[in-house]
Amino acid sequence: LLTLSDQPQWKVVVGGSQTYIPLLTAPLAGRVTTEAGVEHVSRGESSVTLTFADRPPQSFDEVVFACHGDQVLSILSDPTDAERDVFRRFRTTTNLACLHTDASLLPARPRARASWNYLLDGDPDTPPTVTYDLNRLQRLSTPEQYCLTLNPRVAIDESSVLGRYVYRHPLYDQDAIEAQARW
């Protein structure tokens, strides 16, 4: 993907997610429950009941699980053998993300920079350090260089750190591919 003379252009929606999220969610207004801590999901004859951490249970015709497979198994009260087999195959990896303004994690020459900049340490068991050039990705016209680094293995100037976050990302391995094919 990276060449010095012909770099691919990252496509973004004008106005960002503030533009398209309201358009996508408007038809769902009043029909979708979000930001509710679900403790259990149980199936009935004609409905699915959600037990919440901080509100009374609610029943629905259908439920969409927007979470990792292990999370489905921890809240689904009565998973079938097939569901257990499928959802246990979706594994995740934990990643530390650091939002910062330390441009030293990008290549020194601006023309050598890409949207995603990888730093490998040679150990196949260690995830790469990836620094996203947010100015390039988000077309930011600011004098400050904004970066998001995953799994930093080199020191980031602490005065430049705007936030640290821990994420779990799905592993796209053979188990996941086979599980998707079964569902």
Where do the model's predicted regions map?
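Short, loop-centered acidic/histidine patches that primarily coordinate divalent metals
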Residues: 15, 151-153, 177
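Active-site/ligand-binding neighborhood in enzyme catalytic cores
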Residues: 1-42
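Mid-domain catalytic core of redox enzymes
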Residues: 39-172
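Short glycine/proline-rich, acidic loop/turn segments that cap or connect secondary-structure elements
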Residues: 174-183
